[in-house]
Amino acid sequence: MALVDPDIFNKDPREHYDLLQRLGGGTYGEVFKARDKVSKDLVALKMVKMEPDDDVATLQKEILMLKTCRHANIVAYHGSYLWLQKLWICMEFCGAGSLQDIYQVTGSLSELQISYVCREVLQGLAYLHSEKKIHRDIKGANILINDCGEVKLADFGISAQIGATLARRLSFIGTPYWMAPEVAAVALKGGYNELCDIWSLGITAIELAELQPPLFDVHPLRVLFLMTKSGYQPPRLKEKSRWSSSFHNFVKVTLTKNSKKRPSATKMLSHQLVSQPGLNRGLILDLLDKMKNPGKGLPVDIEDEEPEPPPAIPRRIRSTYRASSLGIPDADCCRRQMEFQRPRCVDCRPQAETVRLYPPAHFGSTSPRSQLSDSDDDYDDVDIPAPSENIPPPLPPKPKFRSPSDDGSGGIRDDGQLSPGVLVRCASGPPPRTPRPGPPPATCSPHLTARSDPSLWNPAAPEPGQPPLVPPRKEKMRGKMENEKRREKYPLLVKLFNGCPLQIHSTAAWTHPSTKDQNLLLGAEEGIFILNRNDQEATLEMIFPGRTTWLYCINNLLMSLSGKTPYLYSHSILGLLERKDGRTGSPIAHISPHRLLARKNMVSSKIQDTKGCRACCVAESASSGGPFLCGALETSVVLLQWYQPMNKFLLVRQVLFPLPTPLPVFTLLTTPGSELPAVCIGVSPGQAAKSVLFHTVRFGALSCWLDDSSTEHKGPVQVIQVKEDMVMVLMDGSLKLVTPEGAPAPGLRTPEIPMTEAVEAVAMVEDRLEAFWKHGVQVWAPGLKQPLQELRDPTLTFRLLCSPRPVVVETRPTDDPTAPSNLYIQE
C-alpha cells in the first residue's frame, strides 16, 4: 500500500509511545493516553479499526490536512501510524476530558461558562472556515478541555471521512441530534456549507445547559424525519426564566432554519453573549474544581419524587431452609419435605435447594442412576417412597444411589397400584458435571399432585357393577401416544427460594456476560432484588430501592417501572452490581439514586416525561428491528423502540388518549407487514368470523378505539401474543387462540379451550399452554379439549409471576396468605 506522506508511518506506534491508559471507545475505535518515549510528553492515541476494502488513500489525504491546522482552539496533530489494519492518530492530550464527561459529573454549566465555551469554539470555527474546512461534528463530546482550562475542538475532518468509508459496514453512522436541517435533507435539497457548524454550536449550547440535546429521547430516524418536514420549528431553551435574554437570542440566531440567513462564525463573535467582559479561563478552572469535588453544589432535580421510606426488610435475604437435626419427623412434615424440600439426612449441608416433582415411573422400571458408583455420594438423587398415613416414616438413611426396586419407592404396591415417587436432591456440593437423566416417562394419568395423593396418580378404578372400559381404537392410540410424548416434555418446577418475604410484582432473567451466571431479577414492593441461581446458597440481594411493579431486561440493561410516583427507569445491571458490591456491610440509602453518585457514574436514570406511568409492555418484531416498549401514561400512550447503536430505548410515537380506569389489559400486538404495533387496552366477545374484538390504540395512523368499553368479564382477562399470527386470550373462563385480527387461529381443531378451573393466568411455553389457578397448574396442548397434566395442591396457593422466559411461580400456604412465599422456576 503506497503512502502519500512520510509522516504516516507503517510501523507499530508502541515503538514510539508507551500506552498508559484506555480513555474511552466509540463506533470507530478506542482512545488511549500515552507517553512519548523520548520527550516524555503526554499524547492521545486514537486507534481506528480498518477493513481491507476501506479507502485508506482518502483517509490519508484527510490526515494530511490536519497538519495545516494550527490554532489555539484546535487539538494539535502529531502524526499517524498504519499497522495491522489499524490506523493510529497521535493528537494533543487534553487531561480534563470532554465537556460531556465534565457535565455528567458537575451538572449543567453556568451561563458564563457556556458563554466562554461558545466564544472559544467560535474562534476555532472561524479559523477552520477561513481555511475552507468544515468540522461537521460539533458537540459536547468533541470539545475537549486541557488541565489549563483551554477549550479545544477535536475530531476535525477525520471523523467525517471515516464515517464515509465505514458506511458500507454500518447501517446508520452517528446521530442527527446536532445535525443541521440542510444536512439531514441533503438528499432532497443538495449540499451544505460551513454554516452547518453554527447550527451544531447552537444545539451544543442547549446541551451544556440542559445536559442533553433537544429530542435526545426520540429515535434518530424520527428526528431526521422531523427535521425534513416543512413545519419543523428549531428548538429553544426549555426554562425561559433561568437564562438571560442574551442567551435565548444566541440560541435563536444560531438555530436559524434557513442556512442562507444563518450568520457566520466571524459575525457570531460579535454577539452580546460571547463578547461580554469577564469571560476567561478561570470560569473553566472553577468547573474543573467542581468536577474533582462533585459534592460541592451538586444540583438537585426539582422534579424528584419524595424520598423512599427506609426498607422494612434487610437488603440481603437468605433462603430460610436449613438441614434439620437428626430425628424422626411426623408424617405431615415428611410429606411436606417430599413435596418441595430435601429429606432430613445426616450429610445434608445448607445449600440452594433443587427440588423436582416427577410423574410416577413406569411399571417395573428401575432408576437409571442405580448403576453409578458410590463415589458420587455427595451428589445423590434419592428416591423416597410416599409415606403411609398410618405408619410413621423410618429414619432416612445416608443418601445412596438406589433403585426403586431396592427401597420400595417405585414399582407395584400390595394393592396393585403404582406407588408414586418424588425425586429430591440432597447435595452438599455443586451438581455433577455428567448430564442428569431426564424425568421418568409419565403414566397415562393426566394428574400430578404436589401432595403425592395416590388417587391422583392413576386412572380411577371402575365402580362396582359397571362393565369394563372398551379398548381404544387403533386410530385413537396414535393420538394417545402423542399425548404421552407431550407429557414427557413437561418441564418440572424447581425450587429457587424458600421463605421469601417480598411482595413480588414482576421478574426477569439475566445472564452475566462474564461469569455466565444465570440470575433472576425480582421487582417487588420493597425494591429490585437479584438471585444468582449458580450460588451455593440461595440469597436475595437488593440492587435498587423503591417500589417496582414491572421489569424487562435487554443487553445488560434493565428497564423498570419504579418509585413511589412511578417513572420508567433505565438501569445498567453491571453498574447496579458494582454499586452493591461496593456497599457491602452498609444498607442502601433511601434517597433518590442520582443523589448518591456523581452524574458520570449514574447507573439508574429516569426516562423523561414518564411520570405517573401506569403500565408497560414489550413486543418484539422481526420486521421492524429492535423490540418496542409501550407505556401507559396519565393522558397519553408512548411507544419507544430499542436503538442498538445507543443501547437505549428511544421515543417513536406519542398519542394523546384517555385510557380507561382500571386498565384490565395493556399489551402490544404486532401484525405481519405493519411498521408499528398497536396496543390492546381491552377485549370483548365477537361474532363467528371474529371470535374476539380487540380494543386497540394504533400509532401508525389515527388512534383507533373500538368503543365497547362497557364489557364486563367474569374473571381475569389476559392477552398474550405467542406468535406473529397467534394471540392467546383468556376471557370469561375460556382460553381462545385467535389471529391478531381476532379470527380463530387456523390449523387448530379446537381454537377455544374451556377451562375446568377458575384460571387466573396463562402462559405459552414452547408448544404447551399452562393455565394457573388458585391451587395448581394445568398443562394443555393447543387444539385439545383435555389437559395433558395437572399439578394441584389445595394446601397451597399458586401465582404466576413471569412467563415465558422463564416461568416463575410463587406459592403460599392456603391457610396463611401473608406467610413468606416459596419461588419455583421451570427448567
From Swiss-Prot:
Active site residues per record: D137 (proton acceptor)
Biased composition range(s): Acidic residues: 374-383
Residues at which ATP binds: L23, G24, G25, G26, T27, Y28, G29, E30, V31, K46
Tissue expression notes: Expressed in hemopoietic cells (at protein level). Ubiquitously expressed in all tissues examined at embryonic stage 16.5 dpc with high levels in lung, heart and fetal liver. In the neonate, expression is restricted to the tissues which undergo lineage decisions, lung, thymus, liver, kidney and brain. In the adult, expression is limited to hemopoietic organs, thymus, bone marrow, and spleen and to the testis.
Result after altering K46E: Loss of kinase activity and ability to activate JNK family. Inhibits the ability of CLNK to up-regulate CD3-triggered activation of the IL2 promoter
Basic and acidic residues bias spans: 472-485
Phosphoserine: residues bearing it: S171, S373, S375, S403, S405, S419, S592
Keyword Phosphoprotein recorded: yes
Annotated InterPro entries: CNH_dom (IPR001180), Kinase-like_dom_sf (IPR011009), MAPKKKK (IPR021160), Prot_kinase_dom (IPR000719), Protein_kinase_ATP_BS (IPR017441), STE20/SPS1-PAK (IPR050629)
Coiled-coil segments on the chain, per record: none
Pfam families: CNH, Pkinase
Region of interest: Disordered: 296-315, 359-485
Keywords: ATP-binding, Kinase, Nucleotide-binding, Phosphoprotein, Serine/threonine-protein kinase, Transferase, Ubl conjugation
Sequence ranges assigned to domain CNH in this UniProt record: 501-806
Positions of post-translational Phosphothreonine modification: T165, T175, T354
A GO MF term: ATP binding
Name under which the protein is recorded: Mitogen-activated protein kinase kinase kinase kinase 1
Species whose genome carries this gene: Mus musculus
